[in-house]
């Protein structure tokens, strides 16, 4: 199957989660999720005193529904109303607290946190919030006590240790802060944080030698991580080692696709400026703790807890652009695009992140079905940044997702015209324009674009599959086409669309046993795709398994295929396939089921 769906996002500024995953072991993440408090967990109805079902139970159930939709503000309101009806209910108290915290309703969250720790003194999230409150008030002994109470579970222990180290630094005791950091385990993920925060604390404390050694160690282990790179480069330039700062940033950029912040920092340093340290106060340092861990959690399956940690970071440091971006990403994953827009709106236009963030706003507007607003925003960005490929690429993707292929092709062509010498990084533009040309039935132009994409990046499975499938469908270059499709399947053997392409190619070439084998596998991988089920039905019919064929066609019909496919399926269910060999080109691309959701 040709899957020509537009890419969902491009050039999103984010904390380097791929690097995070290398030092945050999967076992740790599993332990976190198993050990985490009941953030948005299911609650037994029996735990709610239903003596007043019209009010208490109604608010409770409405809160659960809103919580399931990640509408934390509405859920918090319902749970708070339920709590007012049953103030002694510990389950409702905890849920109300967590939801108020996730919604950044700090006055109410703090009140509930104080109530919660009276019942459950070791409640980690409540103790973290109370620790942050005491820290902001300069009550460092009290903050230390709250953070110490939260040490249960791997992430809580890590967070508590880092937070307590920053408390000691705030109290003017950096040596005690270092001693606390030394208590972290020898695991790679823990040592990453130990080196990173040791360097930050040392810089804030004016201990430049210690900072340099710690940050050098962190950068050596993780040169692709944005925050480590920024911290080390800023340390170097403030230590009058401008050459090291430039070298650090260039090494980072050579190992990554580049980030607006690292590129802007390199430009500033090359221009003779001396940017400030990454963290200039203990409050910023504590915010960095919750930002880094929260962003990692949100990207590794701990979405609800990640949002809470990111809210903590902004409670401590309201002007924190990267935390705003991370929170927006989390809302995007939760499909709360309205909140995503609000988070992005907190990024000032002067920030190096601004253009990338505006592009992501366009995708969020598209997700809210506000397509005209999305296009208007991108058109304005294109006008303001006429030499930047990114807004044109985004416009093409969004137009293609709505099958507005002419507008998509125009956007991609304008983007390609800005590239004097295409490189491997530009393959997706040619692929995307190729798909648009193919849908506009301009095959010569489509073929040229797809070939160009493959020449730029020969291992791109999506291009191999699309071009190979298109050739087979037209009876062209059959040997090369099959080689391409097989290579795509080899690169991504668990991709049902590629396996379907291989099976359908065998079907078109008359190798029915091989076709059935591959199409059965494709249905296993993508049981909810109407096109793949239809393909298996056709192949089953041709080898005489007519009952199975009708079952697959009926299954395909139940999966809401496109209207033109419905007529064909109903006809096949009634009369089967004609005896003559299949010769009609199969433009069953599955694009509708894979439309851009973002």
Where are these regions (language model features)?
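Absolute N-terminal positional cue centered near the fourth residue
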Residues: 4, 15, 31-32, 133
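N-terminal secretory signal peptides that target proteins for export/translocation
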Residues: 1-22
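Gram-negative bacterial Sec-dependent N-terminal signal peptides
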Residues: 16-40
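Alpha-solenoid helical repeat scaffolds
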Residues: 42-71, 76-529, 534-598
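Selective for proline/serine-rich intrinsically disordered segments
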Residues: 5, 11, 35, 456, ...
């Amino acid at each position: 199957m040709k899957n020509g769906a537009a890419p969902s996002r491009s050039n999103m500024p984010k904390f380097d989660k791929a690097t995070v995953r290398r030092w945050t072991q999967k076992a740790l993440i599993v332990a976190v999720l198993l050990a985490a408090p009941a953030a948005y967990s299911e609650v037994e109805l029996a735990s709610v005193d239903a003596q007043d079902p019209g009010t208490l139970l109604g608010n409770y159930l409405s809160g659960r529904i809103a919580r399931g939709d990640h509408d934390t503000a509405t859920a918090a309101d319902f749970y708070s109303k339920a709590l007012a009806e049953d103030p002694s209910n510990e389950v409702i108290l905890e849920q109300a607290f967590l939801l108020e915290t996730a919604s950044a309703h700090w006055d109410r969250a703090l009140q509930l946190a104080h109530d919660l720790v009276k019942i459950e003194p070791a409640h980690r999230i409540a103790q973290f919030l109370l620790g942050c409150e005491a820290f902001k008030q300069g009550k460092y002994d009290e903050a230390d006590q709250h953070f110490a109470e939260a040490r249960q579970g791997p992430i809580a222990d890590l967070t508590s240790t880092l937070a307590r180290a920053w408390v000691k630094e705030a109290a003017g005791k950096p040596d005690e802060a270092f001693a606390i950091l030394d208590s972290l385990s020898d695991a790679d993920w823990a040592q990453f944080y130990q080196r990173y925060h040791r360097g930050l604390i040392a810089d804030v404390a004016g201990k430049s030698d210690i900072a340099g050694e710690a940050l050098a160690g962190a950068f050596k282990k993780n040169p692709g991580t944005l925050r480590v790179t920024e911290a080390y480069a800023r340390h170097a330039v403030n230590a009058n080692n401008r050459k090291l700062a430039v070298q650090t940033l260039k090494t980072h950029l050579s190992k990554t696709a580049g980030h607006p912040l690292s590129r802007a920092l390199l430009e500033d340093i090359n221009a003779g400026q001396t940017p400030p340290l990454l963290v200039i106060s203990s409050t910023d340092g504590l915010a960095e703790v919750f930002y880094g861990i929260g962003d990692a959690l949100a990207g590794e399956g701990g979405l609800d807890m990640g949002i809470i940690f990111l809210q903590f970071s902004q409670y401590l440091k309201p002007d924190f652009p990267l935390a705003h971006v991370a929170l927006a990403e989390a809302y995007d994953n939760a499909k709360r695009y309205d909140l995503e827009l609000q988070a992005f709106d907190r990024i000032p236009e002067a920030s190096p992140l601004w253009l990338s963030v505006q592009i992501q706003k366009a995708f969020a507007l598209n997700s809210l079905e506000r397509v005209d607003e999305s296009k208007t925003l991108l058109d304005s960005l294109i006008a303001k940044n006429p030499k930047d490929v990114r807004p044109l690429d985004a416009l093409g993707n969004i137009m293609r997702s709505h099958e507005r292929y002419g507008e998509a092709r125009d956007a991609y062509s304008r983007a390609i015209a800005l590239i004097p010498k295409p490189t491997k990084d530009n393959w997706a533009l040619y692929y995307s324009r190729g798909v648009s040309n193919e849908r506009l039935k301009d095959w010569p132009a489509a073929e040229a674009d797809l070939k160009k994409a493959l020449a730029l990046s020969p291992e791109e499975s999506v291009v191999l599959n699309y071009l190979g499938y298109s050739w087979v469908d037209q009876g062209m270059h059959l040997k090369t086409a099959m080689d391409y499709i097989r290579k795509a399947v080899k690169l991504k053997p668990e991709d049902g669309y590629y396996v379907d392409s291989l099976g359908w190619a065998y079907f078109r070439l008359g190798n029915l046993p091989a076709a059935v084998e591959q199409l059965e596998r494709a249905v296993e991988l993508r049981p909810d795709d109407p096109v793949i089920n239809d393909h298996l039905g056709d192949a089953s019919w041709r080898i005489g398994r007519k009952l199975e064929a009708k079952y697959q066609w009926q299954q395909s019909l139940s999966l809401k295929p496109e209207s033109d496919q419905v007529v064909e399926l109903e006809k096949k269910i009634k009369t089967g396939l004609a005896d003559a060999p299949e010769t009609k080109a199969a433009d069953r691309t599955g694009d509708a089921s894979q439309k851009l959701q973002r």
